[in-house]
Regions:
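Active-site-proximal cofactor/substrate-binding loop regions of enzyme domains
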Residues: 52-54, 72-73, 99-100
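SAM cofactor-binding core of SAM-dependent methyltransferases
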Residues: 3-58
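Flexible loop residues that form catalytic
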Residues: 33-35, 75, 116
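Active-site glycine-rich loops that stabilize anionic/oxyanionic intermediates
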Residues: 12, 74-75
């Protein structure tokens, strides 16, 4: 039986590529606001029958099928050293809370999220702490008894 997943902030499908290479995963839907990334995603993957949302803030929870795993690389510009590092003062910096909104209702067994190293040290670590300890996150992680592991990896996959 396949593990069903929802691909948030899908980009061109990095998470999906890895999951499909492993095998045993089935995508039930995806979310990507960039039209060119969406075109590439749809050119590379058979998305027929999958639910699509362009904007994470407009995801209608009642329309989402059940899934076991939510994967996503929520937007990093607000935390990256290459950007202005505005954190939660930039709307893009608040999109993690859309993940929390979805997970609170859909209750997948697993979350697999990625972001830039700057998320860990933005605002002296307070941003990452807020994400982990916000009321939504505490309710979500406490209720589901998720264990949280964060790891800083290089592009080659080795720990730093």
């Amino acid at each position: 039986m396949a593990i069903r997943f929802f691909d948030m902030f899908a980009g061109i499908g990095g998470f999906r590529s890895g999951l499909e290479a492993i095998g045993g995963f089935e995508c039930v839907g995806y979310c990507e606001i960039d039209k060119y990334a969406k075109q590439a995603y749809e050119a590379m993957y058979d998305t027929g029958g999958e639910l699509y949302f362009d904007d994470a803030r407009k995801i209608v929870l009642e329309q989402l099928p059940d899934f076991d795993l939510l994967v996503g690389g929520f937007l990093c510009q607000s935390f990256s050293i290459a950007g202005a590092r505005k954190g939660f003062d930039d709307t893009r910096g608040t999109l993690f809370f859309e993940i929390a909104r979805i997970v609170a209702v859909k209750k997948p067994k697993y979350l697999f999220l990625e972001n830039v190293p700057g998320l860990l040290n933005h605002d002296s670590g307070k941003t990452f702490e807020t994400i982990l300890l916000s009321p939504k996150s505490c309710k979500l992680f406490g209720e589901r008894r998720h264990s949280i592991a964060d790891e800083l990896l290089t592009a080659c996959g080795r720990n730093e």
